[in-house]
């Protein structure tokens, strides 16, 4: 009798041990074991981050060093990436171009972020920053990566393939970042670019957050941009997933209200300007120099080859200036024109100077924030 009891006890012990081993394979483990778990079994934990993926430079270099001409230090590790608020959608990251898929009907939203457009939670630096007072900095090192700094100053780029990433720039100069003619490859990514109102050289004002003085393309993506009068200024470039807001009006050195735009192009461009999946807000009043949210102006030549796609746009005298007579290759598609500042998105309406008969010009599926389709009036 005692041998039967002992044998049953041994079987029970072995069965309990077997169940414990099987249970540990598919639950409670700190490692990723999703490939070993049955569909109907316990939930398996997988690793991953909700932060947006970085372009290649951030994966291969560390913090920028204290010397402007030195190589970035590989020994300083960045702080963990910040995670967007759970109620917000992560930024679009289909490659470094930020190309988003076919837009969903996104109207009647309380804010751009609620409709999946960039806001403060999905733009700007993702790491802890180190204060750095550079003042005016003429960057002359090809391939330099500036990362992890909270810069007080301005960057004037006389070099190729410079990347500014996970950085904040507070400028008191004409611009935050400027690319000089003859140079190429500038990228400004996951950064905040702002200024102190009243401290700039234009009678206290500041003009350009990112300026492209050359003929090469500049990429600006996932950036939080504010204060500057003509925030993103270029004829060619790739502007995607940015949050441009809180432009501050000022009277310039000429004694006039500075005309303000979140994006401005003066025409005569040789390349392609892409403006895709941004939040572009110009709250400047009509009495204080409001021009456009997006201003495509034929100031220095014909406007050509511009894509304005899947943006949240609001403010300005007109929300969009479309290039005027002679403009070609202008594609305006799938944008939301918000009424948050004016019933017509801009103070006088949605669009002016649209050249409907221009070769390659397309206006398609653009809506007000309440869902109404927008059709441009003929250019006078």
Question: Where are the language model's segments positioned?
Answer:
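Secretory targeting and sorting signals
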Residues: 2-30
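N-terminal low-complexity, Pro/Thr-rich disordered segments
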Residues: 26-125
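N-terminal segments that cap or nucleate solenoid repeat domains
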Residues: 95-168
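Long, ordered, amphipathic alpha-helical scaffolds
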Residues: 102, 107-111, 116-127, 284, ...
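Short, basic/low-complexity N-terminal boundary segments at the transition from targeting/disordered tails
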Residues: 116-120, 125, 206-217
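Extracellular beta-strand/beta-solenoid scaffold signature
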Residues: 130-134, 151-153, 171-180, 195-212, ...
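Right-handed parallel beta-helix
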Residues: 143-150, 161-171, 183-198, 214-227, ...
């Amino acid at each position: 009798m005692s041998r039967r009891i002992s044998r049953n006890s041994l079987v029970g012990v072995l069965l309990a041990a077997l169940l414990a081993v099987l249970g540990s394979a598919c639950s409670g483990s700190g490692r990723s074991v999703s490939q070993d778990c049955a569909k109907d079994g316990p939930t398996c934990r997988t690793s991953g981050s909700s932060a947006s993926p970085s372009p290649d430079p951030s994966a291969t270099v560390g913090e920028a060093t204290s010397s402007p001409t030195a190589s970035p230090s590989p020994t300083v590790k960045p702080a963990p990436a910040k995670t967007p608020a759970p109620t917000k959608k992560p930024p679009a990251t289909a490659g470094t171009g930020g190309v988003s898929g076919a837009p969903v009907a996104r109207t009647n939203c309380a804010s751009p972020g609620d409709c999946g457009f960039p806001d403060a939670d999905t733009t700007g630096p993702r790491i802890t920053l180190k204060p750095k007072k550079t003042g005016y900095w003429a960057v002359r090192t090809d391939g330099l990566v500036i990362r992890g700094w909270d810069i007080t100053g301005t960057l004037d780029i006389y070099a190729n393939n410079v990347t500014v990433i996970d950085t904040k720039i507070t400028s008191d100069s004409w611009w935050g970042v400027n690319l000089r003619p003859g140079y190429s490859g500038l990228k400004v990514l996951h950064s905040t670019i702002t200024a102190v109102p009243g401290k700039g050289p234009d009678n206290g004002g500041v003009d350009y957050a990112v300026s492209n003085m050359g003929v090469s393309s500049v990429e600006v993506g996932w950036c939080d941009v504010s204060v500057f009068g003509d925030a993103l200024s270029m004829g060619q470039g790739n502007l995607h997933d940015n949050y441009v807001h809180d432009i501050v009006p000022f009277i310039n050195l000429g004694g006039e209200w500075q005309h303000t735009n979140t994006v401005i192009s003066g025409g005569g461009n040789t390349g392609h300007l892409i403006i895709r999946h941004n939040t572009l807000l110009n709250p400047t009043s009509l009495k204080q120099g409001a021009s456009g949210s997006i201003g495509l102006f034929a100031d220095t030549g014909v406007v050509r080859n511009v894509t304005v796609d899947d943006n949240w746009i609001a403010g300005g005298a007109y929300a969009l200036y479309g290039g005027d007579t002679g403009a070609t290759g202008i594609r305006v598609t799938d944008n939301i024109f918000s009424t948050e500042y004016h019933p017509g998105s801009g103070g006088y309406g949605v669009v002016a100077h649209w050249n409907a008969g221009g070769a390659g010009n397309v206006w398609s599926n653009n809506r007000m924030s309440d869902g109404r389709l927008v059709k441009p009036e003929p250019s006078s």
